Amino acid sequence: MMSIKAFTLVSAVERELLMGDKERVNIECVECCGRDLYVGTNDCFVYHFLLEERPVPAGPATFTATKQLQRHLGFKKPVNELRAASALNRLLVLCDNSISLVNMLNLEPVPSGARIKGAATFALNENPVSGDPFCVEVCIISVKRRTIQMFLVYEDRVQIVKEVSTAEQPLAVAVDGHFLCLALTTQYIIHNYSTGVSQDLFPYCSEERPPIVKRIGRQEFLLAGPGGLGMFATVAGISQRAPVHWSENVIGAAVSFPYVIALDDEFITVHSMLDQQQKQTLPFKEGHILQDFEGRVIVATSKGVYILVPLPLEKQIQDLLASRRVEEALVLAKGARRNIPKEKFQVMYRRILQQAGFIQFAQLQFLEAKELFRSGQLDVRELISLYPFLLPTSSSFTRSHPPLHEYADLNQLTQGDQEKMAKCKRFLMSYLNEVRSTEVANGYKEDIDTALLKLYAEADHDSLLDLLVTENFCLLTDSAAWLEKHKKYFALGLLYHYNNQDAAAVQLWVNIVNGDVQDSTRSDLYEYIVDFLTYCLDEELVWAYADWVLQKSEEVGVQVFTKRPLDEQQKNSFNPDDIINCLKKYPKALVKYLEHLVIDKRLQKEEYHTHLAVLYLEEVLLQRASASGKGAEATETQAKLRRLLQKSDLYRVHFLLERLQGAGLPMESAILHGKLGEHEKALHILVHELQDFAAAEDYCLWCSEGRDPPHRQQLFHTLLAIYLHAGPTAHELAVAAVDLLNRHATEFDAAQVLQMLPDTWSVQLLCPFLMGAMRDSIHARRTMQVALGLARSENLIYTYDKMKLKGSSIQLSDKKLCQICQNPFCEPVFVRYPNGGLVHTHCAASRHTNPSSSSPGTRT
């Protein structure tokens, strides 16, 4: 059982004020209506007191009762019950089985003497159905056996409305509209006196203890159930609340939301209707009356009257929070909704959620804390402010007052425990990352992102870079100082870049690469800088660091010029001539850049092609002259040179030929002679100097690429002639000639070749050539025959169509009108359309030159 101080017991009417020194006078009943308190005694007196409430700042209110009047009712029986009908200014008094009407002010009976006789007990209908504001509805348990009666009570008269018979003797009753909640001898029932329908609730033994029936709200009742249970029941016969466990000896009960108050021989117990837990126990002996009057709970012994003063719900909630009883506080706060105006409740409830969130946070219950912070719409800066130095110095934030928690900062909250502090920081990182893109961050995104950056930097978290390369609101001054403090220089560069300070960013990264400052965030930082400059739109910045990146690596550094975005290249923002001039000091980079211009961008400029060829040539010559002789590199560069010489038609051929003289590069010389059309000279070099017969064949192929067949045939005939007019190496050339003929039979004029061949060569030797030549000749002849047949067929179709047109006669008279101009024909000359329409020749000609004019159809 978790206790809470929900009520304070305060004395209202002392014994001396009520009865003086009369020992045998006992209190039988009480009634309270506003400030008016009425007490009925066993000696047939009714006392009227005026209650004055005096609030005390540091504690519960006190009450002072002033006796106004007392009156004897003229009987020798005790006053059993009192009920006030303030609308009528009447007090209903049950004494000696009779209900009398007396004036609430002077306690005089009404002049008419109206009364209800034969009443054992009675109850007022607080949800009346008559609709008459000048009467009250009273339900009595009649002294007649098993009888309930309904009355309308006016200022000076009473009127019976209904009499209901019950299956058992009724012992207690409460009324709501047409519904009676009755405690019979053995059970509780709900009875609708309008329809006569009854519904059993649950059994109850009245011989063991007296029943309790209390109306606690619209269409809901509180009943004393078996086993010491306080049961709730609606007029529908169901329970919408769980029962509360009170003692077996309860003699009275009342409701002061959200609490159920029960009275037994020794104690007053307080249970919550929200979670059914017992919240408070007050010692109170000899009590026999417990009733609630319009929210005021009164208890009484036979000698005195007391008031249970509730502590304000907000004070109760704060007490629970102070005791770290978060769940109970939240349950109580939710239950308080019905008693507090909506707007005020929302403000209060949000604050309670926030306080509860900080309590859970202090206990490292981070999931619960996060949910409470979200539900309570916490200004996240309240949380950030717990962490020293996370809020920017420019932040205008001040903590909520009164404060939401008792902690100055995280050090106090964790008592210096580093592990707890680390957990708290990890939670804040996660929470800020979640809320930064939500409405929670609106208005102070700078504070959130700056705090998040500081946490990431301090924890060396990978998300630091993700934060800086996406949209963020980190304040430059605070963030830069923090990153520098934690030696996050690469991240600082990203921050500069995000704030359009690219020059500062690049310089910082350069310092890292140069070793001036230490930051191991990126092992490929040099490549990152090159990539950054490649996409940088600031030409001055690129030029400022071009030498630096090239000095580090010519092959990588040149990418700042060769890999620029395509849209920027199209704008020609960088002049190639300026770049070439810059790269003269960096030969490898210059070659890469010229390759980019010539091969990648396909710029058709002689200067670039010639320059690249010269650089290739110089590199080849340098490699050949090198003592170490890097064969693989020489071969690669030489292959590039040959490919360029073959593919390009823009370089200066004569200039390169002069550079090649005496260089010992016959293959390159042969390619250049080929570019000049000196094919015989080129082939002579390939055959006689290089003796590379495969290269000679390839030469014929690439030189004739894209040219007409006769040109290719001429090249192959030239090569064959060189083979056949052999010198000392006649045998090798003869073999090469045979191989040439057999491999490329279709490239030769067979008749001309046969005249060139020596008579000593056998047919067997040239069998593949002769077969290929025959096959090519037959294929050409048959292809020509097919084409001729198709042409003849097409001509026949056209001839047939023409004959069809000529086969039908056309009648022409001076009454026939031209379908274009609608004038008659004056001569037998006309144009006929496929649809049969006839037009003048000049109209048809006009229609042909002016297609927009109307026409009867396609002309024939």
Swiss-Prot record:
Keywords of the record: Cytoplasm, Endosome, Protein transport, Transport
Molecular function as annotated in GO: SMAD binding; transforming growth factor beta receptor binding
Cellular compartment(s): Cytoplasm; Early endosome
CHCR repeats: 564-728
Alphabetized InterPro entries for the sequence: Clathrin_H-chain/VPS_repeat, CNH_dom, Vam6/VPS39/TRAP1, VPS39/TGF_beta_rcpt-assoc_1, VPS39/TGFA1_Znf
Pfam families xref list: CNH, Vps39_1, zf-Vps39_C
Domain CNH: start-end pairs: 24-297
Main location: cytoplasm
Gene Ontology CC terms, in alphabetical order: CORVET complex; cytoplasm; early endosome; intracellular membrane-bounded organelle; membrane
Any single GO BP term: regulation of DNA-templated transcription
UniProt family annotation: Belongs to the TRAP1 family.
Function: Plays a role in the TGF-beta/activin signaling pathway. It associates with inactive heteromeric TGF-beta and activin receptor complexes, mainly through the type II receptor, and is released upon activation of signaling. May recruit SMAD4 to the vicinity of the receptor complex and facilitate its interaction with receptor-regulated Smads, such as SMAD2.
Subunit structure: Interacts with TGFBR2 and ACVR2B; in the absence of ligand stimulation. Interacts with TGFBR1, ACVRL1, BMPR1A and ACVR1B; in the absence of ligand stimulation and to a less extent. Interacts with SMAD4; the interaction seems to be mutually exclusive with the interaction of SMAD4 and phosphorylated SMAD2. May interact with ALOX5. Interacts with RAB5C. Interacts with VPS8, VPS11 and VPS16. Component of the putative class C core vacuole/endosome tethering (CORVET) complex; the core of which composed of the class C Vps proteins VPS11, VPS16, VPS18 and VPS33A, is associated with VPS8 and TGFBRAP1.
Protein name: Transforming growth factor-beta receptor-associated protein 1
The organism's taxonomic lineage, starting at the top: Eukaryota, Metazoa, Chordata, Craniata, Vertebrata
